[in-house]
Amino acid sequence: MSVEMVSDSTFQKSVIDASQEKLVVVEFSTKEKLNKRGEPNASAKMDSVIDGLDAQYAGEIEFFRVEVNLVWDYSDPQKPMAKDDLNPAASSAYEINHGPTLVFLLEGERVQENLLGFYDEASTRQKLDELLKDLNSRLLKIKLFRFIEEQINLAAQRVITKKSAQLDDIAYGKLGVFLGLRRTLQNDTTAQDIGMLDAMNDSLQCLGVLGKGETILERIK
């Protein structure tokens, strides 16, 4: 699988949407891949590294590539600026003035300073592993929210499509539990939610899933 190439017109749908669920790395790579000596330049080398990492981090990190053509503007000799004429909106948004540059996004926001220049595979992998470790709690919470939303939709659908006049207690129970968890994680807890969570904590502690005195919210967060 090759790294998806995106442009100004597809950046929002491809990159920003993907970053709502997992860490996204965007490589801004120069269109020109050779240096003046006719050898692979830094962008060409970084392309190869990112292509390899794309397979290694499948499911954990989503990689994208944006081609840039940087033209230097010397209208102000004291503050020359590099401007991209291929995908100026994305390049401007992330202050790209060098290729290659890596941008790291989660939930549509940068989670680390841009990484400029070429890094070999081992160095890049080390930086990615450190970032994943730093973002671990946040990534787990995103996965949990997605799971909760899926369970809410499944339970609600089962309640709605129930053909029997008898209430589906299991579906209603699941719906109540997951709605309560969602409200709690969104800091909109009700008294009923607190009672439900206390009961869940007691049960999970008895089963050994949680340690003595530990709560499900502590485990989640």
Q: What are the roles of these predicted feature ranges?
A:
Residues E4-S7, F28-T30, N41, M46-D85:
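Thiol-based oxidoreductase modules, predominantly thioredoxin-like and allied folds used
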Residues D169-N187:
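N-terminal interaction modules that seed assembly of large macromolecular complexes
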Residues S137-Y172:
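N-terminal acidic leader/helix
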Residues E4-V24:
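A short beta-strand-turn-helix
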Residues I152, A156-V159, R182-T189, L204-G211:
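A structural signal for well-ordered alpha-helices, especially hydrophobic packing surfaces
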Residues N97-N136:
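Non-catalytic, surface beta->alpha helical segment in thiol-disulfide oxidoreductase systems
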Residues A18-G38:
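Short active-site neighborhood of thiol/selenol oxidoreductases, capturing the structured segment around
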Residues V68-G99, T190-K221:
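Charged low-complexity stretches with an acidic bias
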